[in-house]
From Swiss-Prot:
Forms a cyclic heterotetrameric complex composed of two molecules of XerC and two molecules of XerD. During infection by the bacteriophage Xf-phi-f1, it may be required by the bacteriophage, which may use host proteins XerC and XerD to integrate the bacterial genome. It is found in: Cytoplasm. Residues 127-318 form the Tyr recombinase domain. Belongs to the 'phage' integrase family. XerD subfamily. One of its GO terms (molecular function) is tyrosine-based site-specific recombinase activity. GO terms for cellular component: cytoplasm. PROSITE patterns: CB (PS51900), TYR_RECOMBINASE (PS51898). PANTHER family: PHAGE INTEGRASE-RELATED (PTHR30349), TYROSINE RECOMBINASE XERD (PTHR30349:SF90). Gene3D superfamilies: 1.10.150.130, Intergrase catalytic core (1.10.443.10). This is Tyrosine recombinase XerD. InterPro entries: CB, DNA_brk_join_enz, Integrase-like_cat_sf, Integrase_catalytic, Integrase_recombinase_N, Integrase_SAM-like_N, Recomb_XerD, Tyrosine_recombinase_XerC/XerD. The active site is at 167, 191, 270, 273, 296, 305 (o-(3'-phospho-dna)-tyrosine intermediate).
Amino acid sequence: MTPRTTNQRRQLARQQPPLLPEDATTIAHFLDALWIKHGLSQHTLNSYRRDLEGLARWNNGRAGPLATLTPPALLDYLTWRTQQHYSPLSNARLLSVLRTFFSYAVECGWRNDNPSTLLAHPVLPHPLPKALTESQIEALLAAPSIETPEGLRNRAMLELMYAAGLRVSELVTLPVAMLNRRQGVLRIIGKGGKERLVPLGEESQHWLQRYLEQARPSLAADKPIPADSDGDVPLFINTTLKRLSRQQFWRWIKHYAALAGIAPNKVSPHVLRHSFATHLLNHGADLRALQMLLGHRSISTTQIYTFIARQHLQQLHAQHHPRA
């Protein structure tokens, strides 16, 4: 059974009834509370909104308002999603959203219980993170043409993403104020507002300097770069003086992968982050240090990379030990 693509899910959502006003108000209150309490990003809040609106539209008031749904109603919805070929990972994410939402409903006095706690968590596969080899990374980083301001900017972005293990959302929203060129470090505000400091290597600092001194003024046509709605001046800009989108960077990295002779379907922004982590471990990095660099809340999230590192050591042993 092939999971639905993003476009298929959106098309299916458009076929559902419109959102009832009461449910729309409930979802809006919940998202406002999440933002105030946890400072979640707009991207995360939009994911929560889509999941809750999908359930509300499917229910369409049949089993009562969204905040009063029972375990059987939620189970019916999860069963329907499975029949519509939603992946176990997508259903697991939905269940996590529902647990948070119904906990909020209990806090607000809308109900006395959390019905989602009675639902079984989907069994998930555990795919290992995919990483590029170090030679593939070198080819990918060298793919942009540095003869143009856009190419020089993109080279700097690729270098920075690999050097610091950034998420794509962290890269494209990075403010100038977060870069300390004198000390060679970045201050990153990651998921859930978690802050971390990431050191930069000589190569990434070199390309950042070239971008800031050559490409950025050219892209801005020497005009002052305005602050965005958050009051931050973006580090990486386009010719309209605005920050770049995640989708733009996604397309570029696929393009540069093809130029580097790497299958585009094997490369994504997150693959660069996985490569950063894998290569550090292969060269002897400490797992706790890697956790801090990646901004993981729990060491268990970071531990998946240890299996990849063990594979690397086994390969080295098999290649070089006289009795392997």
